[in-house]
């Protein structure tokens, strides 16, 4: 009986993307999986779907299939010798798999029954400036796979047992014939039904359908380290996805997003504060109160202080998240020029300019001043 076109088997077009092929395979394999579908012919249908996906999901195999069809290339390489061809296109394993089939060597396959650690997960956590600076405790809710509560992660319906896999007869592998440069070769692949374990369920768990896991919202308490900065992360061991075959759970990585402060600017462990002072304070000097992370302190402004002058308060910054002391607090001075002053203040400023030997060409600051000078004939 002639094989059906692989694209037809999966119900996709020949221009289908990898994602479209994967989506079609998942839908069909779930529909015809022998553990779920007990109808006559479902077993053969599942084999056909698995075979089609194995070829179309691999770029080299797919290109070979598109060019030569099911039978592979005929007549070798058309007299071109090896010609630098990519031999991985013939069966997907290249020379290594070919000679493995003859001599029993080649790559060592990972034991499918060996314990495997679960996948690591990542969660982005937004915290305030104060929570990051001083540390805090917060509870988060994430959606993740956990061991099925019905079968306790076994995947089988409670009260039932595992049986020898009907697809591979308990070997955990199936034989696959491949067209290679050395002719038609039989190789072994991991069984797609039992994933190499050699066993399948008498009856899959009705809750998780044999997966052994279910997706749930889980609440987790997170300790925000004192001094944590934007984009830094912490690892919560064992809070990731469940392991397989008795393997440990994966880890959960918390990545922090720190909201900016309305008062300070942060650069690592250092913080910056912009302080506005008047012309009089800058000229004569003063003592002013400035905020820090832990209350206010008095700062001495020397006479003659200029805009952009910077004062440094040692160890008044943020505690280093790794425990390497504290950063500094930098005070940036901004001398503010008044926009509204009285006539008396103007008179004093003119007098100051005269004493200093300055000749001013005063300019009106608004329409009212312009009108006043116009009617005075100035």
From Swiss-Prot:
Its cofactor is Zn(2+). Zn(2+) 2 binds at residues 165, 168, 191, 194. Binds 2 Zn(2+) ions per monomer. Disulfide bonds: none annotated. Residues 5-69 form the J domain. Pfam families: DnaJ, DnaJ_C, DnaJ_CXXCXGXG. GO terms for cellular component: cytoplasm. Its main location: cytoplasm. Keywords: Chaperone, Cytoplasm, DNA replication, Metal-binding, Repeat, Stress response, Zinc, Zinc-finger. It is found in: Cytoplasm. The keyword Zinc-finger applies. Participates actively in the response to hyperosmotic and heat shock by preventing the aggregation of stress-denatured proteins and by disaggregating proteins, also in an autonomous, DnaK-independent fashion. Unfolded proteins bind initially to DnaJ; upon interaction with the DnaJ-bound protein, DnaK hydrolyzes its bound ATP, resulting in the formation of a stable complex. GrpE releases ADP from DnaK; ATP binding to DnaK triggers the release of the substrate protein, thus completing the reaction cycle. PANTHER family: CHAPERONE PROTEIN DNAJ, DNAJ HOMOLOG 1, MITOCHONDRIAL-RELATED. The J domain is necessary and sufficient to stimulate DnaK ATPase activity. Zinc center 1 plays an important role in the autonomous, DnaK-independent chaperone activity of DnaJ. Zinc center 2 is essential for interaction with DnaK and for DnaJ activity. NCBIfam families: DnaJ_bact, PRK10767.1, PRK14276.1, PRK14280.1. This is Chaperone protein DnaJ. It comes from Staphylococcus saprophyticus subsp. saprophyticus (strain ATCC 15305 / DSM 20229 / NCIMB 8711 / NCTC 7292 / S-41).
């Amino acid at each position: 009986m002639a094989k059906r076109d692989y694209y037809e088997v999966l119900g996709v077009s020949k221009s289908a993307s990898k994602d479209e092929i994967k989506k079609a395979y998942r839908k069909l394999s779930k529909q015809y999986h022998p553990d779920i579908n007990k109808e006559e012919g479902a077993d053969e249908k599942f084999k056909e779907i698995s075979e089609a996906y194995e070829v179309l999901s691999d770029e080299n195999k797919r290109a070979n299939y598109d060019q030569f069809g099911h039978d592979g290339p005929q007549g070798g390489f058309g007299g071109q010798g090896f010609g630098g061809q990519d031999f991985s296109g013939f069966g997907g394993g290249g020379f290594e798999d070919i000679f493995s089939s003859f001599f029993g060597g080649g790559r060592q396959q990972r034991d499918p029954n060996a314990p495997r650690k679960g996948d690591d997960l990542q969660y982005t956590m937004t915290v305030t400036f104060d929570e990051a600076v001083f540390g805090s405790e917060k509870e988060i809710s994430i959606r993740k796979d956990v061991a099925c509560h019905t079968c306790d992660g076994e995947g089988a319906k409670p009260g039932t047992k595992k049986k020898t896999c009907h697809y591979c007869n308990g070997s955990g592998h199936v034989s696959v014939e491949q067209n290679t440069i050395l002719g038609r070769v039989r190789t072994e692949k991991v069984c797609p039904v039992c994933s190499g374990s050699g066993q399948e369920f008498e009856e899959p768990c009705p809750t998780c359908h044999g997966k052994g896991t279910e997706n749930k919202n889980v609440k987790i308490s997170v300790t925000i380290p004192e001094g944590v900065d934007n984009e830094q992360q912490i690892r919560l061991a064992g809070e990731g996805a469940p392991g397989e075959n008795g393997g440990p759970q994966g880890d959960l990585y918390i990545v922090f997003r720190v909201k900016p402060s309305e008062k300070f600017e942060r650069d690592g462990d250092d913080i910056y504060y912009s302080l506005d002072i008047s012309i009089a304070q800058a000229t004569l000097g003063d003592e002013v109160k400035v905020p820090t992370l832990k209350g206010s302190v008095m700062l001495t402004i020397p006479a003659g202080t200029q805009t952009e002058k910077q004062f440094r308060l040692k160890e008044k910054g943020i505690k280093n998240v790794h425990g390497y002391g504290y950063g500094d607090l930098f005070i940036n001075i901004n001398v503010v020029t008044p926009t509204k002053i009285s006539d008396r203040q103007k008179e004093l400023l003119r007098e100051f300019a005269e004493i200093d030997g300055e000749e001013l060409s005063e300019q009106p600051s608004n329409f009212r001043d312009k009108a006043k000078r116009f009617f005075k004939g100035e």
